[in-house]
Amino acid sequence: AINEPGVVGINIGTRPDCLPDETIEYLAELSERMHVTVELGLQTTFEATSDLINRAHSYELYVETVKRLRKYPKIEIVSHLINGLPGETHEMMVENVRRCVTDNDIQGIKLHLLHLMTNTRMQRDYHEGRLQLMSQDEYVKVICDQLEIIPKHIVIHRITGDAPRDMLIGPMWSLNKWEVLNAIETEMRRRGSVQGCKAVKQEFENEKTT
């Protein structure tokens, strides 16, 4: 596909434990002739949460994989985080973003809401009272707090999402995507806030040398 006329870039979604050195070297070669973005599913920086959701790789491995990718500055990285994971507080969700953007040389971020789907283990946890779903107000507040600490040079690719209605147990308010987006904008305006207004500047090795 990359040799087809008109193809100017490639975007790959994967896991930190699925990128051996030879794959990264191949992506580095591609990045010399087209735009290359690698999207990494991090979801959380907390190991206890990782164990609960069976992520099966550590935050340490994620950090190391980002470093290996960014040895090649033309490879851009987009990280995925999920708000509302089991046991995570508002403060932990904000900390997930803080760690993600200060520990790692990333160029983009996608922020998701936990969608509870049918035929999952979390469905049982929810019905047995071990999982609480976020309200729209809670989600809007945490997203705005996260946006404030994300440096302005990092591209926000997503701040909410949706799921198939026939498979979604909750939160049902997430189906009204534009309502959620409008609520986030309204809250940012109420605060007089913008992306990165509380961000801490972080300098990475490849930025010092380019």
Segments from the language model and where they lie:
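Acidic (Asp/Glu)-rich catalytic clusters
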Residues: 1-5, 25-35, 67-72
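Core AdoMet radical
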Residues: 4-19, 34-62, 110
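Conserved N-terminal glycine/acidic-rich loop preference
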Residues: 6-9, 13-15, 60, 69-75, ...
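Hydrophobic/aromatic residues located in beta-strands of well-ordered beta-sheets
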Residues: 10, 38, 77-79, 156
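Catalytic cores of alpha/beta
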Residues: 23-27, 86-103, 166
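Conserved strand-turn element in the central/C-terminal portion of the radical SAM core barrel
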Residues: 45-47, 69-92, 112-118, 125-133, ...
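Aromatic/hydrophobic pocket-lining residues that form the small-molecule binding cavity
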Residues: 62, 93, 139, 143
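Auxiliary Fe-S-binding modules of radical SAM enzymes
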Residues: 101, 107-108, 115-210
